[in-house]
């Protein structure tokens, strides 16, 4: 089983890592190519391209200038400990044991506009480059064209080491990021957990809650060493429960109703 997550825009480089082990990202050459292009942009170009404020644009202009193809603990941090958004509040890697992080290293992958595909302990230098950004390169008009089938092939290398019901990809990523994966080329079926909350008289996906729940699901898989998707139906954290009637073989729906 491989679980894919989206990255986070919010980053934490202030909290010291609680584990010393780290690995190197696989697509450094590709990231370097993107950085070369990003360095040609002015802060105003970055603000326009990414629809961000001028202070954020200046911050990322400097990040691109400082970025190095050499990753060390002095200039980078393990990805799953650096990301700090809603998904990662749910995953809460800072409280996982070294053994749990080692397990996550084998089973969790993070999709990234700059880095392509990251393992949890891969070193990450700070950046901002969302997968949906229409940043053109020699490979095409946007980042989906830039990455092509590279991410899918990298996932297949991992999936092909699994067998039986354990050869499955659990999609805990957003639509924007999962578009970088080509399901028809995957060497395994895909199961997508969907989290809905009761609001306004019906169940609906509420972005903040759904992001956190996807992180909770990834943590649940890691902590319980879950190998087959059927076991995910027992997930029942923070009030969510599996809804068999709303689910099918490729979409597992979890719902909760808190108050009215």
Swiss-Prot record:
GO terms for cellular component: cytosol. It comes from the Bacteria. GO terms for biological process: response to hydroperoxide. Belongs to the UPF0246 family. NCBIfam families: PRK02101.1-1, PRK02101.1-3. HAMAP family: UPF0246. This is UPF0246 protein Bcep1808_2308.
């Amino acid at each position: 089983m491989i679980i894919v997550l989206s990255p986070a825009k919010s980053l934490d480089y202030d909290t010291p890592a609680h584990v010393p082990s780290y690995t190197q990202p696989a697509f450094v050459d590709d990231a370097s190519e993107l950085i070369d292009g990003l360095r040609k942009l002015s802060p105003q170009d970055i603000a326009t391209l990414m629809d961000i404020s001028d202070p954020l644009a200046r911050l990322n202009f400097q990040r691109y200038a400082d970025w190095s193809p050499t990753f060390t603990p002095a200039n980078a941090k393990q990805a799953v400990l650096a990301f700090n958004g809603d998904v990662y509040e749910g995953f809460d890697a800072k409280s996982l044991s070294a053994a749990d992080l080692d397990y996550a290293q084998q089973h969790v992958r993070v999709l990234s506009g700059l880095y392509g595909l990251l393992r949890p302990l891969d070193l990450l230098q700070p950046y901002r480059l969302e997968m949906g950004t229409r940043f053109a390169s020699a490979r095409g008009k946007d980042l989906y064209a830039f990455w092509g089938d590279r991410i899918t092939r990298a996932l297949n290398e991992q999936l092909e080491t699994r067998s039986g019901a354990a050869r499955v990809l659990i999609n805990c990523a957003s639509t924007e990021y999962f578009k970088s994966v080509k399901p028809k080329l995957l060497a395994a079926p895909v199961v997508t957990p969907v989290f809905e909350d009761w609001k306004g008289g019906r169940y609906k996906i509420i972005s903040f809650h759904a992001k956190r729940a996807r992180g909770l699901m990834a943590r649940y898989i890691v902590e319980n060493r879950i190998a087959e998707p059927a076991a995910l139906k027992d997930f029942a954290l923070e009030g969510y429960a599996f809804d068999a009637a709303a689910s099918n073989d490729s979409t597992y729906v979890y719902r909760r109703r808190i108050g009215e």
